[in-house]
From Swiss-Prot, chains A, B:
It is found in: Cytoplasm. Homodimer. Belongs to the DTD family. Its EC number is 3.1.1.96. It comes from Kluyveromyces lactis (strain ATCC 8585 / CBS 2359 / DSM 70799 / NBRC 1267 / NRRL Y-1140 / WM37). An aminoacyl-tRNA editing enzyme that deacylates mischarged D-aminoacyl-tRNAs. Also deacylates mischarged glycyl-tRNA(Ala), protecting cells against glycine mischarging by AlaRS. Acts via tRNA-based rather than protein-based catalysis; rejects L-amino acids rather than detecting D-amino acids in the active site. By recycling D-aminoacyl-tRNA to D-amino acids and free tRNA molecules, this enzyme counteracts the toxicity associated with the formation of D-aminoacyl-tRNA entities in vivo and helps enforce protein L-homochirality. GO terms for cellular component: cytoplasm. One of its GO terms (molecular function) is tRNA binding. This is D-aminoacyl-tRNA deacylase.
Length: 150, 150
């Protein structure tokens, strides 16, 4: 399982012409589920995201506070392309990306764990499998890669 | 060296209140340089980005055309946080991230290779080391992680 976390001041997902979800300050998460991922991968990375100290303290010292300590929100979007292998050739190889119902099930469990930790109203979702336009403002920028196998 | 590529319909970098760079359709690249990276890593990933078939063909089949074949642009931003190790604890460990002049030099060489391949006017940059607001619209979304050590 891989996650690209971007620290945002705002982020939204639009499908067609409808804004389906939006947050103010917090994390935009792009989430890739792999063919060999299980509940323990979901467990590991949901804990990691909720406890990750991605925010400064009041004195401006970095990496001090986590998402709930700054009353932040999370916008989560499923992104199988994160599991691409790119070392050979010019086309991405997606054999390690879990797809369809299996991916959606694990992704749903990941969302449930984030909501359990942060509160339902603080965790937004894209539309699994839809063509989405993800608008965001990455402040810093701050972008962190999490990998459950690392 | 790590790159997070996001396929965008627009992207810009603002420092303070000034928009310092912006592109329309193409790639937003967040680029992390590691302490053990050399020119060969720069060479490898610049070739990979320029030849990567991230775009559909006219019939809508995916992964067929590269950035120059679709007359796309690249907005590149230095992002040392991509080299963070996150497996232990709740704070990112940046010991593997190259910093300062050494990072800036390799990053500059990476930019030069992209420009040589795509044309100077098609490759934009952030401001190395500055606090930047990176606005983007990731279409799909499509996000790919490239790692020169993979």
């Amino acid at each position: 399982m891989r996650i690209v976390l971007q620290k945002v001041s705002e982020a939204s997902v639009t499908v067609g012409s409808a804004v389906v979800s939006q947050i103010k300050h917090g994390y935009m998460l792009l989430v890739g589920i792999g063919t060999d991922d299980k509940l323990e991968d979901i467990d590991k990375l949901s804990k990691k995201i909720l406890t990750f100290r991605g925010f400064d303290d009041d004195a401006g010292y970095g990496w001090k506070r986590n998402i709930s300590e700054v009353d932040g929100e999370i916008l989560c979007v499923s992104q199988f392309t994160l599991m691409a292998r790119t070392s050979k050739g010019t086309k991405p190889d997606f054999h390690l990306a879990q797809r369809g119902e299996l991916a959606n099930e694990l992704y749903g469990q990941f969302m449930d764990k984030l909501k359990a930790g942060l509160g339902d109203d603080k965790v937004q979702n894209g539309v699994f499998g839809a063509m989405m336009s993800c608008k965001l403002t990455n402040e810093g920028p701050v972008t962190i890669i999490f990998d459950s196998k690392a």
